[in-house]
Design a protein with these regions (language model features):
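Glycine-rich, acidic/polar active-site loops that bind/position phosphate-bearing ligands
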Residues: 1-393
Length: 393
């Protein structure tokens, strides 16, 4: 793990000329400011100021100065940039001018949730993501179309699968940036792909997910394609999910964790599915809308996968999509899980039916559904005392 001195030495020895200081708005959109390498020591010591009124969800113009503080443990070379005059990236924490943490810094929000789980509950959470995306062709002006790069389907191979070389480049780039992909394959939709990650701590997993989306877009653009992470880019094809796998250090608390997340599912939805298009995806093509859980059941909100010895506490949240802010979603999932653990909550019985085909009977069984529009999800979240306490704003 790099220290400040390690990074300063690395920058000098490796001919690094530019340092990108990255952070995120409340939607999870990555922002950055690029500084010259000679300014890095000052950035570590004093921070770098920016106009928070220009960032979505942050501050108003009358009091808008905030400071970025690079986290040396997140330094990574950008492999697609030149080898002479190299470029590195670090994620940042955000503070007010007096040094107090900024409450809407989503990386700090997640770090605080991790700290509470560790110090108050003796729990460590680990996250793994499965991120789906489409590759579309560009038109003669270089603008994205809705024409898929190929017409392959689930786990097809070349020549039907035209995305394997791009996935290969993406995986190589991830490894060069210190991220370990586990598997990649073609997904169900034409031009749709998926790459899965090795489990890691919550903050690293969120950093990796955001880095992944950046790499995919960059590598796709280099290949003359457009990478689309939206939840339902083609109305009659499979949507793209952001499946979240969670495990805890004490496997005996899995049921409590599961129950806590189910309890708060409606409140979480606005943050896991934060665009109008998100709600076109839910309810079909393995994107559940019923608040239930099942063993190996992909039609439920939470799936408990077939387990091996090293992931006995793992659960999978199947509804989120890639438009979400992973820092905020992971934060809320941790607090929901802790609520279940603290109050020793127990989940309802697991569902064995296919809820995509048995949905009408599910309502009569008392299985609730997620909000079906962005407006209804927003209203539920705005009224939630759980959300207010977890996020603090």
């Amino acid at each position: 793990m790099y220290t400040v001195n390690d990074v300063l030495e690395y920058v000098q020895e490796e001919d690094v000329k530019f340092v990108r200081l990255a952070f995120f708005d409340l939607r999870g959109v990555q922002k950055n400011i690029s500084i010259m390498a000679g300014q890095l020591e000052s950035a570590f010591k004093n921070g770098v100021s920016f106009d928070a009124s220009a960032i979505y969800g942050f501050e108003t113009p009358e009091k808008s100065d905030l400071f970025l503080h690079p986290d040396p443990t997140t330094v990574a070379i950008l492999p697609w940039r030149p080898n002479t005059g190299k470029v590195v990236r670090m994620f940042c924490t955000i503070s007010h001018p007096d040094g107090t943490p900024y409450k809407k810094d989503c990386r700090t929000l997640l770090a605080n949730a991790v700290k509470k789980a560790r110090e108050d509950f003796g729990m460590e959470f680990r996250f793994g993501t499965e991120i789906e995306f489409y590759l579309f062709k560009l038109d003669e002006k270089g603008e994205p179309t809705k024409i898929p790069f190929d017409n392959a389907s689930y786990m097809d191979i070349a020549p039907e699968d035209k995305g394997e070389n791009i996935r290969r480049e993406i995986c190589f780039t991830l490894e060069q940036m210190g991220i370990q992909p586990e598997a990649s394959h073609h997904e169900e939709g034409p031009g749709q792909n998926e790459i899965d990650f090795h489990y890691s701590d919550a903050l690293t997993a969120a950093d990796n997910a955001e880095t992944f989306k950046w790499i995919v877009r960059t590598r796709a653009a280099s290949a003359g394609l457009f990478a689309d992470f939206s939840p339902k880019p083609i109305s009659d094809q499979a949507g793209s999910g952001f499946h979240i796998n969670i495990s805890i250090s004490d496997a005996s608390k899995q049921r409590n964790m599961l129950a806590g997340i189910l309890k708060h599912a409606e409140e979480l939805t606005y943050y896991m599915n934060c665009t109008e298009e998100s709600y076109d995806r839910l309810g079909s093509c393995k994107a559940p809308k019923y608040i239930a859980w099942g063993r190996e059941n992909r039609s439920t909100f939470i799936r408990v996968p077939a387990i091996t010895n090293d992931d006995a506490s793992r659960i999978e949240i199947r509804t989120p999509d890639s438009e979400c802010n992973p820092y905020i979603v992971f934060t809320l999932l941790i607090y929901a899980a802790l609520d279940g653990i603290k109050n020793n909550l127990e989940p309802s019985e697991d569902v064995k039916e296919n809820l995509f085909t048995e949905g009408s009977s599910s309502l009569s069984k008392g299985i609730c559904t997620l909000p079906d529009t962005l407006d209804s999800a927003r209203e539920i979240a705005q009224k939630s005392s759980f959300i207010k306490e977890a996020l603090g704003f």
